[in-house]
């Protein structure tokens, strides 16, 4: 596994333009690639949206297909403009899906039998993922018909769970090669078909080197097909944080209200800060299943006058909260289900706004946050450590800002969308040469 760090940094040498240059290979006929997702565009998946936009700018003939219907709420204007150019399935497509099964049964009965047998590998101890994979296998029959009709040359799934299951099955039916990206919840834990997908994919992209180490346990062959492709994020942001570091100190947390974010640990740390006499305001931007439990805990800890819940904040508006923040805290944990974050995009965004960061060493986070260099790392599920890190940042503003500036430089070098998405483009071109 010693090669993983080198793979992670292999495309960090030069910056290139996303625009096609006269006489370049971009002028050759573009390969036709299908992207398979659950939803698209999704307001919390700006990293996937940006990848699709930039790959199209590079000249890739890319078509998006979704297993489910439309998510129309909280979309930016740019997302809304692209929303119409998506082929969606969802429950209304069920009659077509059944017809597609009959179509492929007549053409490739042996492959259909193999896909049906694969259902025996689903692990119903994770019913959500297994249910998703069951739907994905059914949807794959209709997707395969569309891929065949549209002359698709490569299939890519943007998640390793149901999306990759659909891509794998459609690849089996059509003979079109497929790849997938492994990120976070989709592989922690992986679904019951992960070995099949790792075996048959021509390329496995991961967001972090930590994910390669995790998936290596399920891969039967060499790791040559693995490629660490860090997400690209817009490097130009509105409003650099002043980091005034004057009371009340502004602490910011952004993310979905789910267990792996560890926001309950941040609230307990906030209680410790209040008990220590620290004057602060804690802002939460996000929504989710744990909204009411978190609000209840806030009340129970007698923090209602210090903690503010903003609800879901669109990507276009979140810059104001970053610009006003003194400290950004992302207290990620490994959930009881083993779900965890890969490398939260909000950490990149906070550093781009020059906000000092406190977070935990979960999964791929240490690939960005080096303790004492680009931010502060603390143990997960340790409110005392979170509180101590916040007090350390408050006590030395200059050192905190210096860490944030080093972190910003690392984001710009490691997560440049032009460089990273060009690397992805080149990977696809190598898979289907023209």
Where are these predicted regions, by residue range?
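Short hydrophobic beta-strand element within catalytic cores of glycosyltransferases
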Residues: 347, 352, 356-359, 369
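Conserved acidic donor-binding segment of nucleotide-sugar-dependent glycosyltransferases
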Residues: 368-372, 376-383, 392-398
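Acidic donor-binding loop of glycosyltransferase active sites
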Residues: 323-338, 355
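A conserved mid-protein helix/loop that constitutes part of the nucleotide-sugar donor-binding site
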Residues: 46, 249, 253-272, 278, ...
